[in-house]
Amino acid sequence: MFARQPLRFAQPLKQGFRKYSTEAPAKGKSSLAPIYISVGLAGLGVGLYRYSTASAETPVVDRPKVFTGGEQGWVDLKLSEIENLSHNTKRLRFEFADKEAVSGLQVASALLTKFKPAEGKPVIRPYTPVSDEDQPGYLDLVVKVYPNGPMSEHLHSMNVDQRLEFKGPIPKYPWETNKHKHICLIAGGTGITPMYQLARQIFKNPEDQTKVTLVFGNVSEEDILLKKELQELENTHPRRFKAFYVLDNPPKEWTGGKGYVTKELLKTVLPEPKEEDIKIFVCGPPGMYKAISGPKVSPKDQGELTGLLAELGYNKDQVYKF
C-alpha cells in the first residue's frame, strides 16, 4: 500500500524574522557608565537569585504510576469515553482509579489487554496507547476492528462503564534524547501507534533534535489514523518532520502516493545506508514485514533483515521491528 512514485513534502511554514537595530553607539564616554553597569549587574544578580530561589522552591510532582511491571498483576480499567474515528476505527478512553496517576509507560513501550470470552481461552493482545505518557487520569487506545480479530471485535463492542484488564508496561525500543540523528518510520494501518508515540516524545523535548521521516500506508484516505496529530507535528516542525501518505485505493483528487511499496520509493525518501547514526522502524501487518524487512521470530528476536531494506543495503543494526 505504498506508492510507486516519489511523494511530495508538505510545504514548510513561512518563518518570521525579528529585525534588530544596527545603529552604532555614540562616540562620547560617560562617567556614569560604571555606575550603570554596577546597578545593572546588581539587578541581574537579584533577578537570578529570585529565579533560582523560586525554581528551588517549585515542587516536583512525582505522580503515582498505574503500571509498574514486574510482579504486578492485571489492572482493571473502566471505559469512560468512545469516539468514532472512521467506519472501522474507534478511540477508547480508559480512566484510572486515581485521577492524579499516570500510566507509567516509557517510550517506546506497550500494554497487554485481556478479556475472557464466554467460551474458550482468554484473549491477550498488545496495544500502544496514543495518549501522552505524562497524561494523568486516563489512557487512550486507537483500535481498528479486523474481521476475525477477537480482541478488536471485543473492544469495538464495549460500552461506556464496561471494564478491561491491562498489564505492563511491555518495553520495546528504549529512547534517549538524540539517540539517533535521523529516524525513519515505515508504518501500515494501526502500526502507526508506536511510531506516533516515538515521534511525539521527540518533538515535545526541546533538547531532542532528531530528524524524523514517516512513510505511512493505508487502504483508503479515511483509514489514515492520527492524521490530525501527524499534520500538527509536520506544521510545527517542518524542517525536521516529513510525512508521506500512501494509499492503495486513493480518491480521484489524491495527490499523494498510490499503490504498493517499491525499492524506488524507499530509495527516494529514506537516508542512504551509508549515512551515520540512522535508524529505521517498521510496524504494520505481516505482509508489510515480509516485504519491507522480514518478520520477527518472536517478541524478543528481531530475526534476520530481508526484504527491500536489505536489498537497498541497510544492515540489521539499522532496523528495528516493532
UniProtKB/Swiss-Prot annotation:
Record-annotated FAD-binding FR-type domain positions: 72-176
EC assignment: 1.6.2.2
Residues engaged in binding FAD: 179-214
Chief subcellular location: mitochondrion
Keyword Oxidoreductase: yes
UniProt GO molecular function: cytochrome-b5 reductase activity, acting on NAD(P)H
Compartment list: Mitochondrion outer membrane
Its membrane topology: Single-pass membrane protein
TM region(s), chain numbering: 32-48
InterPro entries hit by this protein: CBR-like (IPR001834), Cbr1-like_FAD-bd_dom (IPR008333), FAD-bd_FR_type (IPR017927), Flavoprot_Pyr_Nucl_cyt_Rdtase (IPR001709), FNR_nucleotide-bd (IPR039261), OxRdtase_FAD/NAD-bd (IPR001433), Riboflavin_synthase-like_b-brl (IPR017938)
Catalytically driven reaction(s): 2 Fe(III)-[cytochrome b5] + NADH = 2 Fe(II)-[cytochrome b5] + NAD(+) + H(+)
Gene Ontology CC: one annotated term: mitochondrial outer membrane
Superkingdom field: Eukaryota
Cofactor(s) this protein requires: FAD
Annotated function: May mediate the reduction of outer membrane cytochrome b5.
Family recorded in the similarity comment: Belongs to the flavoprotein pyridine nucleotide cytochrome reductase family.
Descriptive protein name: NADH-cytochrome b5 reductase 2
Species name: Aspergillus clavatus (strain ATCC 1007 / CBS 513.65 / DSM 816 / NCTC 3887 / NRRL 1 / QM 1276 / 107)
